[in-house]
Amino acid sequence: VGTNQLKSFQFLAEEFNKKNAAGVKFEIIGIDNKLSPQETTSALRSAMDQGARYVVQGNGSGPALAIIDALEKHNARNPGKEVLFLNYAAVDPDLTNSKCSYWHFRLDADTSMKMEALTTYMKDLPEVKKVYLINQNYSHGHQVSKFAKEIMKRKRPDVQFVGDDLHPLAQVRDFAPYIAKIKASGADSVITGNWGSDLALLIKAANDAGLNNVNFYTYYGSVSGSPTAMGAAAAGRVYMVAYAHMNLPGPLNQIVVDYKKKFNDDMYTGAVYHAFSMLTEAFAKTKSTDPVKVAATLEGMKFKSFNGEVEMRKTDHQLQQGLFVSKWEKTGGKYTIDSENTGHTFVPVKYYEPYVASTPTSCQMKRPS
């Protein structure tokens, strides 16, 4: 997943270097944080030693929090050398609530926002009666479970939660025992925030067990490995809630096509595009690449992106954006770009305007004087 996203940043840097409103040149430094908060802190030091004033990270809210903590200290102690953090995929709501920071801007929709959109879709499906939760045992997985129960109770109090499993992150090799529990529970739907091998192997186990009467509602169905695991067997029964899908019209379309040609891989992290378009617009407005000036410009900024008009909310630096619920189907019609050469893709079934998924914030932002 991380390798794919590094390539996405490098590829889009090349694209934006060809032409951008600010006339700046982007250079990407890739450092492996090994999914560890400790490694992240030393990776951040290394990036800053190499002169980076903007850092991007996304996989894991633990590492994201490590960056926020380190930058709060670094920026306070080193005026004139401030560093800005663009978070493209770490979705723990705390990062823009109790742990919010002036130096952190989130480009993905957080766990609670995605659950608002997903449950708005699910509440209107009469066949959804019994839901099973399976998630990774760390902050993100805990949040998916918590918000699923809280928000569904508000919208469809009759829905029963018949299972709530947490498993170690990226360690389970065989999900058959979990699938057996799902089968035994009588669930008609599974909600999971799993990503990477934890989603790919979960879906594979469901296919192997012939679990054909259960729909899976995912956050990360399009991410590396999962499309291949789903294949034709999962068509029509896996859904995804996300700010994008593979077949968006507009500026992202050609980029996705060109990326696939170049790498024989999918560019599924659209927030990388958000990052470049938002920064170039802010650089052009401020006529500067100084993170202090740019941060002030980003607050409350509205810009057109691939999923409509988006806004970087000033109170907590959480991007307000439209979300799609899409369904794993055979490619065809308007939806010709497939995932991982499977001949299948996530086809949008519903688009929700930003207000539907918007959630309040408890952020008490400390702004630099």
Language-model features, listed with the residues they occupy:
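Extracellular/periplasmic periplasmic-binding protein-like sensory domains
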Residues: 101, 203-275, 281-289, 338-368
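Beta-alpha junction/loop-to-helix N-cap segments that form part of ligand/metal-binding clefts
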Residues: 3-7, 19-95, 107, 167-175, ...
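Periplasmic-binding protein-like
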Residues: 47-61, 78-88, 130-135, 186-196, ...
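Extracellular/periplasmic Venus flytrap/periplasmic-binding protein
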Residues: 38-42, 94, 102-209, 244-254
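Short, charged, surface-exposed loops that flank catalytic or proteolytic processing sites
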Residues: 22, 284-297
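Solvent-exposed, acidic/polar segments of extracytosolic/periplasmic ligand-binding ectodomains
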Residues: 302, 306-369
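Extracytoplasmic "Venus flytrap"
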Residues: 1-10, 31-37, 59-60, 134-143, ...
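Short, polar/charged alpha-helical segment
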Residues: 2-22, 147-154
